[in-house]
Amino acid sequence: MGRKKVEIKRIENKSSRQVTFSKRRNGLIEKARQLSILCESSIAVLVVSGSGKLYKSASGDNMSKIIDRYEIHHADELEALDLAEKTRNYLPLKELLEIVQSKLEESNVDNASVDTLISLEEQLETALSVTRARKTELMMGEVKSLQKTENLLREENQTLASQVGKKTFLVIEGDRGMSWENGSGNKVRETLPLLK
């Protein structure tokens, strides 16, 4: 008799959902560890629970090295896609430029008819508006990317500031505790005040 097939849908019972999450998260991390050992690969697993708690596991290299390698690889892919898109957009504009140049060369603008000049002007305006729209789109994408980076850095700064605050508090508390202890960590006995 085989295992019962479980229907994949949201578990309504909160405690059952938490237990399932915990078991499956541990299973996922174990499978990643096994894959890393069997195939000598670097694997990073990030899991965020429904409550927002982050669980992470890295095998082989540490998490930051794996993420850095991913970002470098992903940036190369994005550059290649961007170059392909620019090339695709460049060809129609190049063709339009060649048409305009040939029209200007084949007939003197002074001898061109009004209809020819109007058509030429419309083609140039169309090419210019397409170029401006693409430029605006690229600039807006860059602004969004910079805003996202700014937000990530701000969150990281807040996290680091809170960690520094906690460590400072622990150091201050530790210093207070040391005032009641001698160097060996044993408590110093208080002496009774002298009678007057």
Curated annotation (Swiss-Prot):
Q: One GO CC term of this entry?
A: nucleus
Q: Does the keyword Repressor apply?
A: yes
Q: Which Gene3D superfamilies match?
A: Transcription factor, MADS-box
Gene induction: Requires EARLY FLOWERING 7 (ELF7) and ELF8 to be expressed. Up-regulated by HUA2.
Explain what the UniProt record notes about the effect of disrupting the gene for this protein. Early flowering.
CDD domains given for it? MADS_MEF2_like
Q: Any S-S bridges, and between which cysteines?
A: none
- Where in the cell does this protein reside? Nucleus
Q: Which SUPFAM superfamilies match?
A: SRF-like (SSF55455)
The organism's superkingdom is given as Eukaryota
One Gene Ontology term of the biological-process aspect is: vernalization response
Q: What else is known?
A: Complex rearrangements within the MAF2-5 gene cluster plays a role in the variation of the flowering time, an ecologically important variable phenotype.
- Briefly state the protein's biological role: Probable transcription factor that prevents vernalization by short periods of cold. Acts as a floral repressor.
PANTHER family in the record: SERUM RESPONSE FACTOR HOMOLOG
| Descriptive protein name | Agamous-like MADS-box protein AGL31
Species assigned in the record: Arabidopsis thaliana
Ranked from the top, the taxonomy reads: Eukaryota, Viridiplantae, Streptophyta, Embryophyta, Tracheophyta
